[in-house]
A protein has these predicted regions:
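Asp-box/WD-like beta-propeller blade repeats and closely related beta-sheet repeat scaffolds
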Residues: 112-158
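Beta-propeller domain segments
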Residues: 20-34, 152, 169-172, 187-192, ...
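Residue-level detector of Asp-centered blade-edge/turn motifs that repeat once per structural unit
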Residues: 55-57, 101-103, 157-160, 210-213, ...
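Beta-rich catalytic cores
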Residues: 48, 95, 102, 151, ...
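Surface loop/turn motifs at the tips and blade-to-blade linkers of beta-strand repeat domains
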Residues: 42-46, 87-92, 140-147, 196-200, ...
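A short loop-to-beta-strand structural motif that recurs across blades of beta-propeller domains
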Residues: 69-72, 113-115, 183-185, 234
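Short loop/turn segments immediately following the C-termini of beta-strands
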Residues: 65, 111-113, 119, 168-170, ...
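Conserved beta-propeller blade signature
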Residues: 59-62, 105-108, 162-166, 215-219, ...
């Protein structure tokens, strides 16, 4: 498996203050890109932009970890820059970070709740008429822990039409008091039938599915306080449900935790496909199968 690590800055959020477009261009010029690639600003002044999900029509939905806003962005004239920004909600007060568009609907994850915005793009058309988002979301789950440490969520609907929701460890390193922590869960789209899909996952904020095998691949952020050089963050693959990926007992496939590692050997757990380096905090992960990149980028996983 070849792995390509590329950083794409598609949003510049309001945590960074720019006095003019020249300052933005100077920032972009500091980013090293492969030959033939170009980077530009898609949208500016999107408060605390964090997670994104894109509809087939090109609408970009944006969640955040610090503000209370969820936005929809449209490039109406196709010039690669946002022409219209919609405030879908400013009433979700507990880190509405996770967003996942699926068949006309938008799922939004707070720390402890999952919301459904039905027919979201149809409602954006009504927004143009009335000047505000016309419908309140539907609460489909309030059964997740309220811990904010690793509590913000990346979510996505999988190829099995179920919603995948991680639950991070409520600490840097600990044995959790409830088995729901340090997992990836999945549920039906109405919030029912939640189950644990993967265990021993400290804090994943990026996962995707292989376009041919259908297997989930996910990044995991490694623990702190073992120095600058240990342990690595990870890229993992899920071949079957309910397997354990090591946390808090083993890190990087072969590093026994100094506090909890004596309880289980590293051989008891699924090893990473790739160690990514210590404290690199991998986030989004995608397999590329579009038609804009060179052929050698096809079917590679991008982190």
């Amino acid at each position: 498996m070849r792995i390509l690590s590329i950083i794409f800055l598609t949003l510049i959020n309001s945590n960074i203050s720019f006095s003019n477009d020249l300052e933005i261009e100077e920032l972009l010029n500091k980013i090293n890109l492969p030959d033939g690639f170009k980077i530009s600003i898609y949208a500016n002044n999107i408060e605390n932009a964090r997670s994104m999900s894109i509809s087939p029509s090109g609408t970009v939905f944006v969640g955040n970890r610090k503000a209370d806003n969820v936005f929809a962005l449209k490039d109406i004239d196709g010039d690669g820059k946002v022409d219209k920004k919609y405030l879908i909600t400013d009433k979700l007060k507990n880190m509405p970070n996770g967003v996942s568009y699926h068949k006309g609907d938008l799922y939004v994850a707070e720390v402890n709740k999952i919301w459904l915005f039905k027919d979201v793009e149809d409602n954006l058309k009504k927004y143009d008429e009335v000047g505000f988002y016309p419908e309140d979301p539907i609460l489909i789950s309030d059964e997740f822990p309220s811990d904010k440490h690793h509590g913000w969520k990346y979510i996505s609907v999988g190829p099995d039409n179920r919603l995948y929701v991680p639950v991070g460890a409520p600490c840097n390193i600990c044995e959790s008091r409830d088995e729901i922590y340090s997992t990836i869960t999945r549920m039906d789209l109405d919030g029912s039938n939640r189950e644990i899909f993967a265990r021993g996952v400290r804090n994943t904020v990026g996962f995707t599915w292989h376009p041919e095998t259908g297997e989930m691949w996910f990044t995991d952020n490694g623990r702190d306080m073992l120095g600058d050089n240990y342990p690595p963050c990870e890229l993992n693959r899920i071949s079957k449900p309910n397997e354990h990926y090591g946390y808090p007992y083993c890190h990087g496939g072969n590093i026994s935790d100094p506090e909890f590692g004596s309880k289980y050997p590293c051989d008891d757990f699924i090893k990473p496909v790739q160690n990514l380096g210590p404290h690199v905090a991998p986030l989004g992960v995608k397999f590329y199968n579009g038609n804009m990149f060179p052929e050698e980028y096809l079917s590679l996983i991008h982190i």
